[in-house]
């Protein structure tokens, strides 16, 4: 589908169109998932502009394309395809394992923040978790490819490890939760 017109006025009464031509309420669980994918994708772009490492930028752009692929597939009910596969999940897991091997073990939860880049990545992590919850809800009545849930779960781990790794690279001490 190509966008040729931005203002269509077809959504002015609380409905939107899907790729198959059907109309649904803008609060439909499928639309919630598509919207949350869009939020996360936009935020990954916001993370990207704070990063100077070309390798990480390329990796984040791959993630953005994966998220767009999932959103496009979601817009065609009943035809959801495996837009992210085992190789995509393996790439995320490799990023987590590599990054985590460079970090000290955690004793407590990490307080989000510390540096601008780290704070953005922690927010992206929470957005990925939110998307995961919405996808699980949709999956209950509308089966989705299982790899989607795995991918989004691993994606939040990627953002967590990248937040820690980049904060450390920026020379900012990591603050951990001190419970009383």
Language model region names:
Residues 1-180:
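Phosphate/pyrophosphate-binding loop motifs in nucleotide- or prenyl diphosphate-using proteins
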